[in-house]
């Protein structure tokens, strides 16, 4: 079972993602964070197997938080999610070292498994 840290400033999105993860046995949400600063702290405390990271958040954005997490653990698995899915935006997300990018409108267990399995770095 993969232990997941959900990072998004929108409680509604976190609730939707938790509901999606609760429908399968392969994933367990172990922590949530509302911004990148809290995500970095939660990652250090919880050591999740996967971080599902939003981009646009207060204090520290998801791109910077991803870089900080990967600086502390280069093997960390971070998947970026965003409402924006333009090619240049996806490239910025992947340039952080994230494992992949999934547009929020396309977020599903199947898309996440594709990214985690290395089949595709971008599900958008």
Model-identified regions with their sequence ranges:
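Acidic catalytic/metal-coordinating carboxylates
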Residues: 35-38, 61-64
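Active-site beta3 strand of CheY-like receiver
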Residues: 46-52
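Conserved sequence signature across two-component system core domains
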Residues: 7-8, 33, 51
């Amino acid at each position: 079972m993969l232990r997941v840290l959900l990072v998004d400033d929108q409680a509604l999105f976190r609730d939707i993602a938790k509901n999606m993860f609760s429908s399968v046995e392969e994933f367990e949400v172990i922590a949530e964070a509302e911004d990148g600063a809290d995500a970095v702290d939660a990652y250090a405390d919880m050591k999740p197997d996967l971080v599902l990271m939003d981009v646009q958040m207060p204090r520290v954005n998801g791109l910077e938080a991803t870089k900080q997490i990967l600086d502390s653990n280069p093997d960390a698995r971070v998947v970026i999610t965003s409402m924006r899915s333009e090619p240049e935006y996806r490239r910025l997300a992947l340039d952080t070292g994230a494992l992949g990018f999934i547009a929020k409108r396309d977020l599903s267990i199947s898309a996440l498994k594709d990214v985690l399995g290395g089949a595709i770095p971008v599900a958008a």
